[in-house]
């Protein structure tokens, strides 16, 4: 069985824990004084319509009496490591998705720690007892079902879906609960008469593929409880990535370049925070028909430079577009071949590092500002179009 454990409003919950006077109040991390965007919002703040990626000025208008606090990303990372250490007490098979969520496969530790339900309860209680933080747990035989279960249980929830209860659990849910279905996809499916997951499950596979192509096959598999993905151990240790599925398919190169710029910044920042260098850059590219492609390039020298990562990613995008000019549903950038950033480096003989030093200073300043004001408080001009669109249509 697989557990999906997701910390509830993680950044905001940490602030409420550390400052008892904030408990029970609407707390907004980032976006203070109307600058930048909201990084996280407590559930009390969400009742006023505030959510992550919202402009701070909008959040203030929605809830003027909210407590706006500056983000402390290094502190959140430290707390996240403590959460992950608790996960590893119950199973070595842990796949972190971010600081505040992970998949856990507990199939091999049942004899040691009890049933999956007992393990899930113990994990949640241990996090509450040792870290004084709330977490939601979903348990299911499939990864995507465990994720849905934890989402449905939020906040501070616990939902278990037995192996023989997957169909009963999924059938009444809206199609938007399926992985890969955004607002545009939901509208398209509803227009075709598919409102619940059961509507997709009972549809003939060939008929669905004729309507929706490979995307239809993907949805049919999920609706019928078919998900062959395994929990991947040490996912973040082997690579760092960032990707976005678009509310509307993109086709113009200007918009795609803006997304690549945004993804490069976010991925490079995570790389530097982890004190790693990357020697491989991979661009992931999903077409409107759900076919997915990727192109990778190995670097001669490992890097953590945003500019270097961006330049390679843009070149990979141009190569991909020349082969695959159709509209794009998803773009992603992942960094692999990671090495320790603190390890000794080969020095240049003739001073070529001057430009690298300038780029490094820009990255350091950008990271410092992001830590103080939120990750969207400063970004490259080339990212502007995507950040504006993202803030207008945020992902909750």
From Swiss-Prot:
The gene is dinB. Binds 2 magnesium ions per subunit. CDD domains: PolY_Pol_IV_kappa. This is DNA polymerase IV. Belongs to the DNA polymerase type-Y family. GO terms for cellular component: cytoplasm. Monomer. It comes from Rhodopirellula baltica (strain DSM 10527 / NCIMB 13988 / SH1). Mg(2+) binds at residues 6, 100. Poorly processive, error-prone DNA polymerase involved in untargeted mutagenesis. Copies undamaged DNA at stalled replication forks, which arise in vivo from mismatched or misaligned primer ends. These misaligned primers can be extended by PolIV. Exhibits no 3'-5' exonuclease (proofreading) activity. May be involved in translesional synthesis, in conjunction with the beta clamp from PolIII. Its cofactor is Mg(2+). Keywords: Cytoplasm, DNA damage, DNA repair, DNA replication, DNA-binding, DNA-directed DNA polymerase, Magnesium, Metal-binding, Mutator protein, Nucleotidyltransferase, Transferase. The record marks 11 as: Substrate discrimination. Residues 2-182 form the UmuC domain.
């Amino acid at each position: 069985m697989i557990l999906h454990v997701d910390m509830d409003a993680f950044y905001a919950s940490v602030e409420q824990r550390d400052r008892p006077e904030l408990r029970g109040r609407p707390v907004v991390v980032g976006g203070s004084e109307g600058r930048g965007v909201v990084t996280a919002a407590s559930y009390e703040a969400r009742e006023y319509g505030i959510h992550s990626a919202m402009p701070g000025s909008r959040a203030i208008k929605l809830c003027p009496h909210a407590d706006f606090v500056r983000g402390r990303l290094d502190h959140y990372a430290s707390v996240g490591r403590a959460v992950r250490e608790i996960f590893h007490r119950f199973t070595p098979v842990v796949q972190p998705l971010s600081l505040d969520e992970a998949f856990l496969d507990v199939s091999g530790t049942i004899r040691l720690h009890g049933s999956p339900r007992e393990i899930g309860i113990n994990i949640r209680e241990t996090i509450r007892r040792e870290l004084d933080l709330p977490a939601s747990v979903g348990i299911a035989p499939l990864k995507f079902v465990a994720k849905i279960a934890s989402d449905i249980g939020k906040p501070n929830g616990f939902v278990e879906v037995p192996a023989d209860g997957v169909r009963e659990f999924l059938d009444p849910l809206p199609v938007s609960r399926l992985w890969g279905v955004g607002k545009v996809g939901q509208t398209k499916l509803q227009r075709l008469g598919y409102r619940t997951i059961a509507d997709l499950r009972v549809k003939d596979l060939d008929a669905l593929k004729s309507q929706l192509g490979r995307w239809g096959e993907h949805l049919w598999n999920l609706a019928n409880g078919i998900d062959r993905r395994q929990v991947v151990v040490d996912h973040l240790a082997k690579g760092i990535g960032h990707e976005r599925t678009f509310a509307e398919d993109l086709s113009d190169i200007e918009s795609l370049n803006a997304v690549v710029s945004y993804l490069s910044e976010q991925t490079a920042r995570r790389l530097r925070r982890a004190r790693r260098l990357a020697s491989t850059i991979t661009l992931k590219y999903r077409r409107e028909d759900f076919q997915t492609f990727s192109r990778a390039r190995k670097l001669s020298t490992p890097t953590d430079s945003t500019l270097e990562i961006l330049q390679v990613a843009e070149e990979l995008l141009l190569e991909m577009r020349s082969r695959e000019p159709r509209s794009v549903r998803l773009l992603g950038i992942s960094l692999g071949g990671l090495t320790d950033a603190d390890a000794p480096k080969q020095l240049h003989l003739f001073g070529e590092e001057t430009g690298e030093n300038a780029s490094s200073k820009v990255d350091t300043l950008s990271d410092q500002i992001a830590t103080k004001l939120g990750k969207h408080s400063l970004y490259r001009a080339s990212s502007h179009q995507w950040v504006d669109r993202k803030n207008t249509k945020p992902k909750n």
